[in-house]
Amino acid sequence: MDYEIIVVGGGHAGIEASLAAARMGKQTLLITILAEQIGAASCNPAIGGLAKGHLVKEIDALGGQMGLTTDAVGIQFRVLNESKGPAVRGSRAQIDMDRYRVYMRNLLLNTPNLEISQEIATEILSENGEITGVKTHLNNTYNAKKVIITTGTFLNGLIHVGFNKLEAGRVGELSAKDLSSSLRELGLNLGRLKTGTCPRIDAKTINFEILEKQDGDAKPVAFSFRTKNFSPTQLPCYIAYTNETTHEIIRSNFDKAPLFTGQIEGIGPRYCPSIEDKINRFGDRDRHHLFIEPQTLEATEYYINGFSTSLPYEVQVQMLRSVKGFENAKIVRHGYAIEYDYVEPTQLKHSLETKKVKGLYLAGQINGTTGYEEAGAQGLMAGINAALSLDNKEPLILRRDEAYIGVLIDDLVTKGTKEPYRMFTSRAEYRLLLREENAILRLGGYGHELGLLDDETFNEIENIRRNLKEGLEFLNETQITPSKANLELLASLDEEPISQNVSLQKIVARKSFTAEKLRKLDERFVNLDDASMDQILTECKYQHYISEQKNQIEKMKDMMDVKIPENFDFRSISGLSNEVVEKLEKFAPPTLFAASEISGITPAAIDILHIYIKMSEKKA
């Protein structure tokens, strides 16, 4: 059975990879252990968040699916950090996790060029260092020139609840043990990571009346630029708190916690610790927040965000019932920790293709990341690049100044990770340029060029770009004088008067200036769409800082654009230390800029490398 691209794993990375490949016209096969669980939210029933919302918007701008599906099945929408600057705001949605699965599965089953087979991949087939296909537990062999592995926590997965251990990729689902062995046989180095999840509670056993209520935004904002007429049904979340009794119950059972007994060897996520880890590390705190989140529109089960645990079941019940509002709580699904194998991501190119095996791509948690959004972003890029490679085209490699996706992948392949990696706005050097609301302007052109965004959507994006350019030119070039009429106009807008000529941009840049005021400032803005208005306001208010960051990038542009030829002989360069040569050979950076990001590569080494690349180009 022959295909062009095979995707192994039907989680968030696998969905984006298989959809991108199929939508780019490639005959694609998705192999997954359980078809009903395609798109399952293994942990929290939410998409987005700080920095993660940026990733979802970027996935959408490139023509990916996560944002569209979230808008269709979301049950609460909020913008986090709304009072702060636009660079650090993050969109987040609670999703109906059941409907999310059904939506994604139906979408995949109805996508042309895409087939699904419920099997367990056991062996990755290759010949002379090139991928040839995949073998499954049913002894079926599927041939393909490109294979994308998106196994999540299923790669040699091991679940822990107290002293009990269970080989599984998720509760009730088999793990993929043989695939780990196959990856090792291909010469890849594997490590071990750990994550966990919390108990799910029967809603009718929770006393919501004494919990703090947290509603969604009054005017919810859609994730996808392509979502129209957005008016979701929203449910509230709630906030509860642990207390000293809870903490004492947990402390007295540390000897039963796999995290502390040595039973768990994998390293867990630093920024999403289990409740027992929190109590151990932050013993001085008298309480911890718990966010009580509905799992579906029917709200029959609630997810206890902040209560991830692998303590024994009876201890989970005891510590849960010590929390106010949960005195009579009943657990529907217990919390657990899970260990799984991952591939050290420094063995990847920026295209997410492995360096050792041509045609083999990895995406998602197998690369050491944590989070649906990080997985989806990698899956999309792997699917795109596998399809481009089949057409003998250059891979799409997003720079750090272009996208959070670029930051994510560059961090993984140049620095690696020894713990589950999650995205933060602080990881992006140029975050003022990488805002959520301008993702479509940054990346929409790529999505359209790849055939993943249609002409109508692209024309809308270009219209916003045109409105932004013309709006900024008008505001920067138009002076407002302190005439009587202008002072009256400012007063009518509830704005401070001026005493000298200033550009309209200076007025719009004021913190108090809103889109409503801009529409009244000049007739050209009256009928502009909200997306264009948002762009104009943000660019005006942060014009100085945006300009500074663009200047920094411009100075580095020469270095960013200089490509390092594949199989470049670094050892032939005199003046490079053995340490520098070894690191360049190990990471194989595609550009000078990528080389400069590698720890231990000095500016002097970059200058020498630049000279030798130019010399080799002249010789060629």
From Swiss-Prot:
Signal sequence region: none
Protein residues bound to NAD(+): 268-282
Taxonomy, superkingdom: Bacteria
Key words, A-Z: Cytoplasm, FAD, Flavoprotein, NAD, tRNA processing
GO BP of this protein: tRNA methylation; tRNA wobble uridine modification
Family annotation (Pfam families): GIDA (PF01134), GIDA_C_1st (PF21680), SAM_GIDA_C (PF13932)
GO cellular component, one term: cytosol
Gene Ontology terms for molecular function: flavin adenine dinucleotide binding
Subcellular location: Cytoplasm
NCBIfam families noted in UniProt: mnmG_gidA
HAMAP family xref list: MnmG_GidA (MF_00129)
Family of the protein in this entry: Belongs to the MnmG family.
Subunit structure: Homodimer. Heterotetramer of two MnmE and two MnmG subunits.
Free-text function comment from the UniProt entry: NAD-binding protein involved in the addition of a carboxymethylaminomethyl (cmnm) group at the wobble position (U34) of certain tRNAs, forming tRNA-cmnm(5)s(2)U34.
Protein name: tRNA uridine 5-carboxymethylaminomethyl modification enzyme MnmG
Species name: Campylobacter concisus (strain 13826)
Gene symbol of the encoding locus: mnmG
